[in-house]
């Protein structure tokens, strides 16, 4: 790896505040002052939120009882060369992207970090075009063969500009939001000739 002075850094975080949406059914962020300049001489705030608010990294323990938490991940595993792929021109509500879509646009090397620009950051809560339902419930997501491709490539981690790195209809959102699932099912039948259950 190059010297740090040779590396350009990017801040990819979405601003966090009381309006930042949490993962559906999760506790949203709450903030309150417990000290003020007057009379305490300093401001102090208490902030509570669930682990799925704003920009974050899921540790292996999120899906695996024996998995490690984020604090135990080595920073050297998180800092690595990477590539950004722009899929925003093909992005649509409930869209599906594949490993082939990515490899047609960029070269992904073994061990890379992969950042996927779906274009759905424009629906983030802090954007003039904010649309929480599109950002969290209708964003594009990967095909089922994507996970094996990620494993084969030994991708270090994946970043996305929307509510989840997974397709929303390949998560519990499908059960929690039946009207969204019905809309997705209709789209899949029209576009792919398959039902939602056949795709995911």
What are these regions (language model features)?
Residues 1-200:
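Active-/binding-site microenvironments in catalytic and ligand-binding cores
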């Amino acid at each position: 790896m190059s010297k740090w002075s040779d590396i350009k850094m990017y801040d990819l975080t979405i601003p966090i505040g009381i309006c930042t949406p949490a993962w559906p059914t999760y506790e949203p962020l709450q903030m309150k002052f417990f000290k003020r300049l007057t009379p305490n001489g300093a401001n102090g705030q208490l902030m509570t939120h669930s682990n799925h608010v704003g920009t974050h990294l899921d540790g292996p323990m999120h899906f695996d009882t024996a998995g490690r938490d984020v604090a135990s991940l080595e920073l050297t595993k998180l800092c690595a060369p990477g590539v950004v792929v722009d899929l925003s021109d093909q992005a649509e509500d409930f869209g599906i992207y594949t490993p082939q879509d990515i490899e047609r646009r960029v070269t992904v090397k073994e061990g890379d970090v992969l950042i996927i620009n779906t274009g759905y950051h424009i629906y983030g809560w802090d954007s003039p075009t904010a649309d929480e339902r599109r950002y969290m419930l209708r964003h594009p997501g990967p095909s089922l063969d994507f996970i094996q491709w990620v494993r084969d490539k030994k991708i270090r981690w994946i970043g996305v500009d929307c509510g989840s790195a997974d397709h929303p209809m390949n998560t519990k959102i499908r059960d929690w939001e039946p009207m969204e699932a019905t809309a997705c099912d209709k789209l899949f039948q029209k576009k792919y000739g398959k039902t939602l259950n056949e795709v995911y």
